[in-house]
Amino acid sequence: MIFSTLEHILTHISFSVVSIVITIHFLTLFLLVDEVVGLYDSSEKGMIVTFFCITGLLVTRWIYSGHFPLSDLYESLIFLSWGFSLIHMVSYLKFKKRKNNLSAITAPRAIFTQGFATSGLLTKMHQSAILAPALQSQWLMMHVSMMVLGYAALLCGSLLSVALLVITFRKAIKIIGENNNFSFSFGKIQYMNERSNVLLNTYFLSSKNYYRYQLTQQLDRWSYRIISLGFIFLTIGILSGAVWANEAWGSYWNWDPKETWAFITWTVFAIYFHTRTNTNLEGVNSALVASMGFLIIWICYFGVNLLGIGLHSYGSFTLN
């Protein structure tokens, strides 16, 4: 009873704090008042509080349930939110007193995942239950934690690539919207990519353009680093899952929906790294691949659970 109450309290504290953090962050982003009242620093400290609250929540549920809290969709969403908070913590320690643009990605992701986890759709999963026989293995912690951390890092890196594309093609998108012409061929993308590369040489003429160039370079650099980390986690998760599957079901790979989409996700980001090796394809083109990867990850992590079929059906839920 005590652990259940503590878990409930920590859940609401972390959700409330991260909500305040997002509000503060957008105030500092659009009103530019962080230099006056120090709101930006307050939002960073708020994410630290959120990180420790979610950590306490996971530890409490671990003690209360007697197993590592990654047995269903609810627990994995909480762990995913913890992963976003962890990435934010690492970037905060990296930047220290400099402004950290990554918080614009991690904070909304944390509140989105935790908000969905605590919603009425997953009420039946809020109470910890006896671990399913298929999950009673030491591989649970290794496999699922690596996969979820990989999802968290890849989602953050992909959103940074989306932000890069928005900044790069903002004027082109505005023109297309005004003309009500929504056809957007790869030829146009290639043209705009070449045009943007030419414009990079003239950015020094305007301080605003120079700042935009610096921002896109920073987004591209951080996107590559975070996606690299997520790709490593994803690879370890897939390999450990294959070993676990062989022990549990006698086969390393069964091509059920979850495994198939995990392989598709891995392939998409392998293509992303291939584009990074070619100087003519890196930048905008690699960001396009990463942006597609963002959708693929959500299908792999969440969309497949809606099917409720396959060897991973124990983590699924149905919309009533």
Curated annotation (Swiss-Prot):
Keywords: Chloroplast, Cytochrome c-type biogenesis, Membrane, Plastid, Thylakoid, Transmembrane, Transmembrane helix
Gene Ontology cellular component annotations, sorted alphabetically: chloroplast thylakoid membrane; plasma membrane
Gene: ccsA
PANTHER family the UniProt entry points to: CYTOCHROME B_B6 PROTEIN-RELATED (PTHR30071:SF1), HEME EXPORTER PROTEIN C (PTHR30071)
Presence of keyword Thylakoid: yes
Subcellular locations according to the entry: Plastid, Chloroplast thylakoid membrane
Keyword field contains Cell membrane: no
NCBIfam families named in the record: cytochr_II_ccsB (TIGR03144)
GO molecular function, one term: heme binding
Pfam families membership: Cytochrom_C_asm
Subunit structure: May interact with Ccs1.
Family affiliation: Belongs to the CcmF/CycK/Ccl1/NrfE/CcsA family.
Topology versus the membrane: Multi-pass membrane protein
Principal localisation: plastid
TM region(s), chain numbering: 13-33, 46-66, 73-93, 147-167, 226-246, 259-274, 289-309
Function: Required during biogenesis of c-type cytochromes (cytochrome c6 and cytochrome f) at the step of heme attachment.
GO BP: any one term: cytochrome complex assembly
Origin: domain of life: Eukaryota
Species name: Gossypium barbadense
Protein name (Swiss-Prot/TrEMBL): Cytochrome c biogenesis protein CcsA
